Structure formats: structure tokens, C-alpha cells
Amino acid sequence: MGFTQQQEALVNSSWESFKQNPSYSVLFYTIILEKAPAAKGMFSFLKDSAGVVDSPKLQAHAEQVFGMVRDSAIQLQATGEVVLKNGSLGAIHIQKGVVDPHFVVVKEALLKTIKEASGDKWSEELSIAWEVAYDGLATAIKKAMS
């Protein structure tokens, strides 16, 4: 079964909830660094800070990550596949030293952050929609890395 309109709608609505509160970006990176402290150096806006400090660059990067997952949901619903809009994403991830376990950590952080942003709207269906959309994006990035 393909990605449904309902799944796309779930991702879109929770994406809007995420964007409304900048603290979710800090939460996202906090979860990543709790799981993978060594990943701190991969993010230029974090590597020289004592911890996760809110900044315009952090906000922009988090919105970009979550936005790409949202775009993946739209693409999956429309065409059944994810095509990267930014052709350099593979090279950037290679340059930063991203490996498969990093994708798992980011997925977990993304889901925990969306759960927090969604509040009482969180459901298994919402989780699955984000998981499928993220997996589509991760697959496209990994393909671009090979």
C-alpha cells in the first residue's frame, strides 16, 4: 500500500505544530546528542558550544530536516518515491561522516520531537506516517551517498 492522503495530512498538520515552537528544534538536537554525543561535531552550529544552544542556524537546520521529511510525505503520496531536490545532500552527508546508525538516531529524535509537538494528537498512525516519510528521505539520501 502506498503513502495515503491521510498520512500526508497527518505529517502536514504536525509539521505545522513543530514550526510554531522553536524549542522543538532544541529538543531535536538534544535527543540526537543524548544518543550520539560524537555527532556534535557534524553540526557547525553545535560543535563549538557547550551543549545545544538555540540559534538561528540551529532553527534553520531543524526546519530544513523536518521540512524535507514533510516534502518526502508529499512526494510519496503523489509519486510513491522520494527524489532529492538538493543534489548535494549525498556529498554533504559523506563529508560529515554520516553512516547508517546516524540515520537511526535522527529518526528516533525526529519521532520523539514530533510526538512532543503533536501533544494529544499523537497516535500510532501519526508515528507511522512520519516513519515512512523519513525512511523515504533516508533512502534517497543514502542512494545519493553511494
UniProtKB/Swiss-Prot annotation:
Binding site for O2: 61
Protein name (Swiss-Prot/TrEMBL): Leghemoglobin 49
Compartmental location: Cytoplasm, Cytosol; Nucleus
Function: Leghemoglobin that reversibly binds oxygen O(2) through a pentacoordinated heme iron. In root nodules, facilitates the diffusion of oxygen to the bacteroids while preventing the bacterial nitrogenase from being inactivated by buffering dioxygen, nitric oxide and carbon monoxide, and promoting the formation of reactive oxygen species (ROS, e.g. H(2)O(2)). This role is essential for symbiotic nitrogen fixation (SNF).
Subunit comment: Monomer.
Domain of life: Eukaryota
Major location category of this protein: cytoplasm
